[in-house]
Amino acid sequence: MNIFQKIPYHLWYLYKTEFLRKEVIRCCRKEAENADERKAAELKEVETYLQKYCFTLFPYRFIKKYDKIRIEVERDEEGSPFVYRGSKKLFFPEKWSDERCRNYYREILTEQDKESPHCYISDDKRLPGEGDSIADVGGAEGFFALDHIERAGKVYIFECEEEWQEPLRKTFSPWKDKVEIINKYVGDKDDEGRNFVTLDSFFRDKKCDYVKADIEGAETALLKGGESTFRNKVRKTLLCAYHNQDDEEKINRYLEEYGFTHEPSHGFMLMAAGYLNGDKDSFKPPYLRRGVIFGSR
């Protein structure tokens, strides 16, 4: 593609993001009219950011501190890249360049900032308990499980992406006695042919105190297939709610039915990638999505 072919797309992208910036500001003001005090303040934060800065996934100033953060990538004797997360090694796929590792880990640091709408542990009440059995569903690189590995009694990491299998094995090799990596999807039905399992079938004879899930919008299917587990075993849960516009409402409904109280993470995310790539139905008013729902009982 030559420079003349690039210009129209670039201008189109700028036009779309500017349109969305103004549209979200308008929606923030409209939503705030009937919002409670907390939500009104959160909406004002988004509006204030977008009045000064460009449209972005996390419309908050905290993201600026990660622009130039220094991230050291090292490699083990087999050439596998890793970063230190505290004193623990977090591994990435061997074929990844150091720069790709740095960019990926920067995204983790950004989304898990205490001010981020995607932050899992924004306060101590969200922490797993000592000796808890944790299900990390959609574990990816495993940072969540790694952060809580020492307090956990057992950790089950559900991750199907092949490129993460070896990095996960290396990351958790010091704790292999209490970590199980399960190469299955979690959904609302058991289906061996499609490699799906429900929480209810997997944990039928196992302890499960804590469930964290980030599974591309399938969190409601996980809840449907985990009714007995949630009703009788789980005490705390973190469920991502940003993939689909109505996920927050659906997740809250399941949690209430299962006897949980719930609260959202602070702030909102602006999930516009699909819209900017041509899927107009993927990003609609009121545009703002909660990142994570915390449930407890």
Where on the chain are the PLM-derived regions?
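Phosphate/nucleotide-binding beta-alpha loop and adjacent structural elements of enzyme active sites
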Residues: 1-297
